[in-house]
Design a protein with these regions (language model features):
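N-terminal secretory signal peptides and thylakoid transit peptides that target proteins
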Residues: 1-16
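A short helix->beta-strand "capping" segment at the edge of beta-propeller domains
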Residues: 28-41
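Beta-propeller fold detector
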Residues: 33-36, 77-81, 119-123, 163-167, ...
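Conserved beta-strand positions in repeat-built beta-propeller and related beta-rich domains
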Residues: 57-62, 100-104, 143-149, 186-190, ...
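A short loop-to-beta-strand structural motif that recurs across blades of beta-propeller domains
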Residues: 65-67, 107-109, 151-153, 193-195, ...
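Blade-level signature of beta-propeller repeat domains, shared across WD40, Kelch, NHL, RCC1
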Residues: 303-328
Length: 328
């Protein structure tokens, strides 16, 4: 593996409360820009998803809202999700709406856009507290989701029916993703494995990684359908090729890396956040090369990464900031 190039972000807060922090980054012209959320109350920002209007949604886990951030003005808007809400994950659906995993309400919540209409899809009656985490849409347009208490579930979007299945080996389901072919994979943080869902039966088949007790936290597919895994316990970034069954593993740079979020952009560049180093890394699989993007703020706490063409969005759960790395 080649040495990393360190590109620590530079810049300082401007005088205006919502002024952006610009961080020029060398080489490929990528740059980081950051904003304080500037909301009247602490949101507990957790996950982000690009919205169809050029804004960015975020889950306000602490306040029970869906946030919408406007990069042009630096302004945030909060949409209340319901009593007891504690949203975790958010993604944009095929219908251009925000779909949210809300562990506080024990429901999947849809927020229409731009009408902001809120609809909850509760888990089936009798389902214990699920600790809902993340969601992904399959090739048929149905939503699959994880519950860290030990479930994997589905919302049949056309009918609104919600079903759940117990996860293999109990608690731990966390990250989930869909491949370009429409298949769905998820990972177990407590179980240290990844799994593929049979979309017809809802059952999951476990795939064992080469590193024991690695703490698979999140997964993401590249354009070839390979599954990239952020390993919390081991500090590794790994990839599984379902076609060949082959695994590859790379240790994140640094003394004590803690890999949390993983995302693959439109160029098949992999992005992974490191709690141990207060940084985000890009990884070029062709050159097997990491590039580091550091934060000016301590304990940024990037728990998830998502983007759109030319933009990689980062929610800073530890600082109430939102950041973007522009790659084009």
């Amino acid at each position: 593996m080649q040495p990393i190039s360190r590109r620590d972000a530079l810049g300082a807060l401007g005088a205006a409360g919502l002024a952006a922090v610009l961080s020029p980054l060398a080489a490929q012209g990528a740059r980081m820009q950051s904003w304080p959320l500037g909301t009247p109350r602490r949101t507990g920002i957790h996950d982000v998803a690009p919205a169809p209007d050029g804004g960015v949604w975020y889950t306000a886990q602490r306040s029970g809202h869906l946030g919408w951030f406007d990069p042009k003005s630096g302004r945030s808007e909060l949409v209340a999700l319901g009593p007891g809400s504690s949203p975790h994950g958010v993604i944009q659906g095929p219908d251009k709406a925000a779909w949210i995993t809300d562990s506080g309400q024990g429901a999947i919540v849809r927020v229409g856009w731009p009408d902001r209409g809120v609809r909850a899809y509760p888990l089936p009656d009798g389902t214990p507290y699920a600790n809902l985490n993340t969601a992904a849409f399959d090739g048929a347009g149905d939503l699959w989701f994880t519950g860290q208490s030990g479930i994997v579930g589905k919302v049949a979007v056309q009918t609104g029916a919600v079903s759940v299945k117990p996860a293999p080996r109990g608690r731990g389901p966390y990250g989930i993703c869909a491949t370009p072919g429409g298949d769905v994979w998820w990972c177990s943080l407590a179980g240290s494995y990844i799994a593929r869902i049979d979309r017809r039966s809802g059952e999951s088949t476990v795939v064992e990684p080469p590193t024991k007790n690695q703490g698979a936290r999140r997964v993401w597919s590249d354009s070839r359908g390979r599954i990239w895994v952020s390993e919390w316990n081991s500090g590794n970034l790994s990839v599984h090729d379902p076609a060949s069954g082959r695994w590859q593993v790379w240790k994140l740079p640094g003394d004590a890396p803690r890999a949390y979020a993983v995302y693959v952009d439109e160029r098949d560049v992999v992005w992974v956040s490191d709690f141990g180093g207060n940084a985000v890394f890009s990884f070029d699989p062709r050159r097997e090369r990491f590039e580091r993007y550091g934060f000016d703020r301590e304990a940024a706490g990037v728990r998830q990464i998502l983007g759109r063409s030319g933009e990689v969005w980062l929610p800073e759960s530890g600082t109430e900031h939102i950041s973007v790395i522009r790659t084009a």
